[in-house]
């Protein structure tokens, strides 16, 4: 079993004001979407089913990107000898597909399904703490399930940005769509890290758009494993830092972060994890240097602002703590609330 558990589940510039059409601003403190807005998005979801040679069944979520095309995760269809989608109890079988096995993105083509497509957005201009909407068809749920969340990190990878978000996945929801608050499709939910404090990863819509330009392949063609299912040492660094970070294995985290920085010297997230490792290893001066490098590239990096605020509080620097409150609150009220909790004596 891979360390990063396969879960059957399946950001955009700020908008100044909400529109009467249901468009919502993408600022961190934006109002929650209306029920009518969410209902319109739900109409484009389908349940994806697959069967394998041993008689087993797999389930996931898909979303229509044209009246004839549905995108989902390839691992939902992997090694299947039968696949279909269903909408309000009516099933359709695909006639062809396009596959990006490496990035775990597959697009099925149908005839006569006459699906309601969503509008594809942009995954290259998203920002940390941007609100998102995840809609899935988990397990045996007969109706779509909505989860609201925020973008927590963006990882440059293979020419696009893999998104980590706070919107949790549930079993049966692989391939579910992630929307911005304008209702545009920006990512496909794909996998989670192990543990109770899991990281939830979403594949960028850029890869979906690129896949649409590729040729179709026969159904049930032999599949390949995605990048996240490789041995640990071959996985992206943004996956490799999670367990040592969450388990407090600071020396190991430093080793992984050093390797990450060697490969990507300007990576914001690599610098952040390096700073965190040095801080917890007792190297406060080095940690501060790395944190400052993060802020040079990303002045509003939430985790770094919070870490420096906690260090200021420990040093009794009341003025810096107050600046941290103001900075976090300007990004998202919830971040300041989290900071307030972190300041309380443990």
What are these regions (language model features)?
Residues 21-38, 188-252:
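C-terminal cap/linker of serine protease catalytic domains
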Residues 63, 169-189:
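Catalytic nucleophile loop of clan PA
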Residues 273, 307, 341-342:
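Canonical tetratricopeptide repeat
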Residues 25-29, 33, 76, 116-163, ...:
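Flexible, gly/ser-rich surface segments that form the specificity/activation loops bordering the active-site cleft
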Residues 55-57, 66-144, 159-162, 220, ...:
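Conserved active-site neighborhood of the chymotrypsin/trypsin-like protease fold
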Residues 19-63, 70, 82, 249, ...:
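N-terminal activation segment of mature serine protease catalytic domains
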């Amino acid at each position: 079993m891979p360390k990063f558990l396969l879960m059957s589940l399946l950001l955009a510039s700020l908008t100044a004001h909400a529109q009467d059409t249901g468009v919502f601003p993408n600022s961190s403190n934006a109002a929650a979407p209306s029920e009518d807005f969410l209902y319109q998005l739900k109409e484009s979801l389908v349940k994806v089913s697959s069967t394998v040679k041993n008689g087993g069944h797999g389930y996931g979520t898909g979303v229509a990107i044209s009246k004839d095309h549905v995108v989902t995760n390839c691992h939902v269809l992997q090694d299947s000898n039968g696949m279909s989608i269903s909408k309000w109890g009516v099933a359709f079988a695909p006639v062809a597909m396009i596959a990006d096995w490496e990035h775990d993105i597959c697009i099925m083509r149908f005839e006569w399904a006459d699906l309601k497509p969503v509008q594809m957005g942009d995954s290259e201009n998203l920002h940390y703490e941007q609100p998102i909407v995840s809609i899935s068809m988990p397990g045996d749920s007969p109706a779509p399930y909505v989860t609201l969340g925020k973008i927590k990190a963006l990882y440059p990878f293979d020419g696009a940005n893999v998104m980590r978000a706070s919107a949790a996945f549930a079993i049966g929801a692989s391939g579910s769509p992630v929307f911005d608050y304008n209702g545009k499709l920006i990512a496909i939910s794909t996998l989670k890290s192990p543990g109770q404090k899991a990281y939830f990863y979403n594949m960028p819509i850029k890869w979906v758009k690129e896949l649409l330009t590729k040729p179709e392949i026969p159904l049930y063609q032999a599949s390949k494993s995605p990048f996240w299912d490789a041995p640990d040492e071959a996985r992206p660094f943004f996956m490799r830092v999670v367990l040592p970070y969450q388990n407090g294995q600071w020396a190991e985290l430093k080793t992984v972060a050093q390797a990450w920085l060697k490969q990507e010297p300007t990576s914001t997230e690599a610098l952040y994890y390096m700073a965190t490792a040095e801080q917890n290893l007792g190297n406060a001066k080095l940690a501060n240097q790395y944190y400052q490098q993060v802020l040079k590239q990303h002045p509003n990096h939430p985790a770094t602002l919070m870490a420096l605020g906690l260090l200021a509080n420990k040093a009794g620097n009341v003025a810096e703590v107050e600046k941290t409150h103001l900075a976090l609150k300007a990004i998202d009220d919830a971040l300041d609330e989290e900071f307030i909790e972190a300041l309380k004596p443990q």
